[in-house]
């Protein structure tokens, strides 16, 4: 894979797009023994894969599920960017078959799949870095942004500090205890010109190219807003499988939840004291 793709160059030149990501995932999915079953998946996700991966791709596509409008919130899952995100997930899952549908993974399960070499890429957050270090000997990993979606204006997005990013390609490292800590440091501290600390990581971490990527990510503006309603229905939908395992068409899935989500959001905002 590394011989075919210069992933760092793709990232830094902002050519790390959904189309390129899809191509790489297809080249990263293998039936290693010819028995007709996939042994190495292109992608796994933290927690229930169809929740975390979909959310991460949505952020990367500038496709929020909600938007603040006047004194309330509008559910906008029926707009093109969000529907396009769900459609892309369907393509990766059912057409390309690069995401496993065999397990409803818990967070640890999907992480373990990646850590043990069962998937080439994993989408997750920085607080799992320490877990990775304790699970696999002699491992370091690359850090890549979630790829740029077609509605993102050609730019990477970071929803909140240390939010979802793509971790990929385990490789060997002599200093396994230090592997991956660079990501935690940069995303938590966001240094503007901390060359001394960077130099110390360069000495310890095998995959030094990730330092450039991490530093770039740490300086991106955050896109977080406060419009997502903290309601039972919204939480259930956002942390759910988005109809993907059942092959429910995106527009059909959204239509099935839109009215209830909007009604609950309207009720929540009607109780808010906006004076």
Question: Residue ranges of each PLM-predicted region?
Answer:
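Extracytoplasmic/periplasmic substrate-recognition and gating elements
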Residues: 134-203
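Paired acidic/hydrophobic, glycine-rich loop segments that form the ligand-binding mouth/hinge
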Residues: 120-125, 142
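Short, solvent-exposed loop/beta-turn-alpha elements that line the ligand-binding surface or hinge
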Residues: 11-14, 41, 63-84, 149-158
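Glycine-centered hinge/linker elements that transmit conformational signals in sensory
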Residues: 18, 22-27, 64-104
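Extracytoplasmic/periplasmic solute-binding protein
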Residues: 2, 14-74
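Short helices/loops that flank or line small-molecule/ion binding pockets
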Residues: 22-27, 107-122
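Aromatic-glycine-rich donor-binding/catalytic loop that engages nucleotide-sugar donors
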Residues: 1-11
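Conserved C-terminal helix/tail region of periplasmic/extracytoplasmic solute-binding proteins
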Residues: 171-180, 188-275
């Amino acid at each position: 894979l590394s011989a075919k793709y210069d992933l760092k160059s793709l990232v830094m030149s902002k050519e790390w797009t959904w189309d390129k990501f899809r191509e790489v995932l297809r080249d990263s999915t293998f039936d290693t023994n010819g028995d007709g079953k996939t042994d190495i998946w292109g992608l796994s996700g933290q927690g229930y894969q169809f929740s975390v991966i979909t959310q991460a791709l949505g952020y990367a596509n500038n496709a929020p599920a909600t938007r603040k409008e006047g004194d309330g919130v509008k559910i906008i899952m029926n707009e093109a960017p969000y529907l396009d995100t769900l459609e892309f997930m369907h393509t990766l899952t059912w057409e390309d078959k690069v995401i496993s549908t065999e397990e409803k993974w818990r967070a640890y399960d999907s992480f373990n799949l990646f850590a043990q070499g069962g998937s080439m890429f994993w989408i997750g957050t920085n607080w799992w870095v320490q877990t990775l270090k304790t699970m696999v000997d002699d491992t370091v990993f690359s850090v890549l942004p979630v790829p740029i979606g077609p509605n993102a204006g050609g730019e990477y997005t970071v929803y909140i500090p240390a939010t979802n990013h793509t971790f990929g390609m385990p490789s060997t490292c002599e200093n396994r205890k230090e592997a991956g800590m660079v990501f935690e440091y940069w995303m938590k501290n966001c240094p503007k010109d901390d060359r001394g600390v960077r130099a110390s990581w360069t000495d310890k971490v095998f995959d030094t190219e990730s330092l450039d990527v991490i530093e770039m990510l740490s300086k991106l503006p955050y896109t977080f807003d406060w419009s997502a309603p903290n309601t039972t229905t919204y939480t259930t939908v956002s942390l759910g499988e988005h109809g993907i395992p059942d092959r429910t068409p995106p527009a059909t899935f959204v239509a099935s939840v839109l009215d209830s989500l909007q009604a609950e959001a309207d009720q929540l905002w009607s109780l808010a004291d906006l004076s």
